[in-house]
Amino acid sequence: VELTPHQERMIQLKDFRKNCRIALRPFRYDGSLITHFTYKEYDYAKEVEIATIQNENYRLSFNSMAVLNEPISIKIYDKPKKYRDRVLLYESTGVANSEFTTETNEMIVKLKEAKSKKLAENTDISDKERSYQKKIIENIRLKKLFINYIIPYTERGYKIDEDGNESRVLTKGSIILAVGYNNL
């Protein structure tokens, strides 16, 4: 039985997901997510949300072996797209044909720095309020992560069938994310 290109791709993605999960070690596996996308004639972002257990350090393992066309970018924030004051916690560009990990400890440091800077710039609060806000910042945790995959613009391809009918060729890609936490 010959496999369809779609079936072949699904088998391949399963292998990539397994590699992604292995890269989490010694962290405890918590879940994985395959995000499929189609290249369009404009840049756009796909956002996925990950919930975290508050006091744990998480490792995020990415596998972009199924990003077969233009490389994508990854940006991780503390809040969803609709918030203007969200903080960029992690960024990676030129993501394609690679496997890599990042951890939330580094992201929390960035979040604390951004919040401390904002507090320092705020001049119209009392000393009591300022010291209260400093304590909040010291103990800040990430409850959720908002991962944005930025898919770049790609020229549309066209194909012509035997009857001379033209149709668009959809260029697709996938990125895999596995998440694990340090369970000590």
Regions found by a protein language model. Name each.
Residues V1-E47, N183-L184:
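Non-catalytic extracellular/lumenal accessory regions of secreted precursors
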Residues T4, Y39-L184:
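Acidic, Ser/Thr/Pro-rich low-complexity intrinsically disordered segments
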